[in-house]
């Protein structure tokens, strides 16, 4: 069965890729399976300089997912270009670089830096990380700022730009339309929901940062709803994410309006989850009357 999907800058052999922040730069997972099996890899966020991240503890398990407040820990964009990208480029899979910053100037610098390499196929513009005290959240929750940073990154980069939207907004459609108008080539959605967990013995937040990003199955219905709403109003492709653990979840996302998907938290529970989903997808598509991924995209919203 044909599982391929063509998106701006991305010729995916299948619509499955690990989400940024849940796969590092693929090194550990490459010891479990051939990364060439994946449609693509969304790399861990890159900033202008090295970041050590937030204080610990910065991860907490929840009843249907997890909270994290990592704080964009990374070695800096040049180290990523020099060391991580060449290693990933050995695999036959698309590479998406996630870029972040605490100012428009930093976003511009990081985006332009990736022009050095032809091995990165597209950028994922992280305007929505909810756990960084400087920047991030302001870009992801204000349509004007989101539009401005998207315009700057598009001008600085020679690669397609997928803007990662935050669900922590009053109107996700307004945000999507703003970045589409700014020239975004696609969207990735949703990022994590802001949450908190209390440590009962101390009566204080369990995470040192107090709040963290909630991910996992708990947020899937929110993601499905938001993608459905955005798909009615924008025409650019959507990479859907949030709580995906199975091929059935993937099909649900595609029907709601996504064109490809990213798997996040589930990688921590099962390092083979992306490969398992890829293997299960043909049978699930056939079960529901589809003969390819493109067939799902063409027929979604149509009840036969």
Swiss-Prot record:
Tell me the residue numbers annotated for binding FMN: 20, 44-45, 98, 126, 164, 190, 216, 242-243, 264-265
Give the pathway: Pyrimidine metabolism; UMP biosynthesis via de novo pathway; orotate from (S)-dihydroorotate (NAD(+) route): step 1/1
Q: What cofactor does this one take?
A: FMN
Keyword list, A-Z: Cytoplasm, Flavoprotein, FMN, NAD, Oxidoreductase, Pyrimidine biosynthesis
Q: Can you list the GO cellular component terms from the UniProt entry?
A: cytoplasm
Per its record, the protein catalyses:
(S)-dihydroorotate + NAD(+) = orotate + NADH + H(+)
Q: Give the principal location in a single coarse category.
A: cytoplasm
Q: Which GO terms describe its molecular function?
A: dihydroorotate dehydrogenase (NAD+) activity
GO annotation, biological process: 'de novo' pyrimidine nucleobase biosynthetic process; 'de novo' UMP biosynthetic process
Cell compartments where the protein resides: Cytoplasm
Q: What is its EC number?
A: 1.3.1.14
Q: CDD domains this protein is in? A: DHOD_1B_like (cd04740)
Q: Which family does it belong to?
A: Belongs to the dihydroorotate dehydrogenase family. Type 1 subfamily.
What this protein is reported to do is described as: Catalyzes the conversion of dihydroorotate to orotate with NAD(+) as electron acceptor.
Matching entries from NCBIfam families are given as:
PRK07259.1, pyrD_sub1_fam
Q: How does it assemble?
A: Heterotetramer of 2 PyrK and 2 PyrD type B subunits.
Q: Which HAMAP family match?
A: DHO_dh_type1
Official protein name in the record: Dihydroorotate dehydrogenase B (NAD(+)), catalytic subunit
* Organism whose genome encodes this protein: Oceanobacillus iheyensis (strain DSM 14371 / CIP 107618 / JCM 11309 / KCTC 3954 / HTE831)
